[in-house]
Amino acid sequence: MGKTGARSHPSRRVLLQHTLLLSALGWPALAGASPKPSAQRAGAWADWDTFAQRFLQPDGRVLANAQGQTHSEAQSYALMFALIANDRPRFKSILRWTEDNLFAGDVTTRLPAWLWGQKDDGQWGVLDSNAASDADVWIAYALIEAGRLWNVRRYRALGRSLAQRILAEETADLPGLGHTLLPGPVGFVVEAGQRWRLNPSYLPLQALRRLAAVAPAQTAAQWQSL
């Protein structure tokens, strides 16, 4: 099943409002930053701490709605906020939960499932294994930048591996548009070679430009064309 445009639950709208506020406040802090692998948090970021206290579980899972579900987008935003806040412990726990539960234990072998929560039988796990490319791009970006800023080789390697998989599984050549990022790997080709379903909000230009800048020579042109 592909991701669909479900109605927004009030709790998810609150999460989105907090996310947009944090994005507006926090993005300048990352721009132009240079690596300081030994740096600690420079100071309190009250909005990030409020977000974490309200939505982030101790194990690194972000609660997205009243049903206790988690979306890959929420995990990707939390990774970005933790990076901007220089909050390495939270970044590590968010990544660990995301890798264990949405990537089935290995970032290098698959795209993350976009929806996780309680199943009909009462067990908790993946509810929809399709991926959401906006989350995938932000996760790859956060990992690559965390690797650069904190000098963590594993983060850089994971980010680059995920970026390669995004190109392989979530892009297509569209007539008149060229190489294009699809919203996910499954469910967005309406008619093969003729019609596709797109979502322009899934194209964060600053993240795409950064992924193009750090991509291997053989794929840099593909990223630049998105």
Task: For each feature predicted by the language model, list its residue ranges.
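N-terminal secretory signal peptides
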Residues: 1-10, 14, 18-24, 28
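Short N-terminal micro-motifs specific to bacterial/archaeal maturation
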Residues: 6-7, 69, 81-82, 130, ...
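Structured catalytic/translocation cores of nucleotide/phosphate-coupled proteins
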Residues: 15, 79-82, 94-99, 105-107, ...
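Low-complexity, Ser/Thr/Pro/Gly-enriched N-terminal "stalk/linker" regions
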Residues: 21-26, 32-73, 83-129, 176-180, ...
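Extended ligand-binding clefts on enzyme/binding-domain cores
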Residues: 37-46, 68-72, 133-134, 156-226
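Well-ordered alpha-helical scaffold segments within catalytic/enzyme domains
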Residues: 74-88, 97, 137-152, 203-218
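Substrate-binding cleft of extracellular glycoside hydrolase catalytic domains
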Residues: 103, 108-165
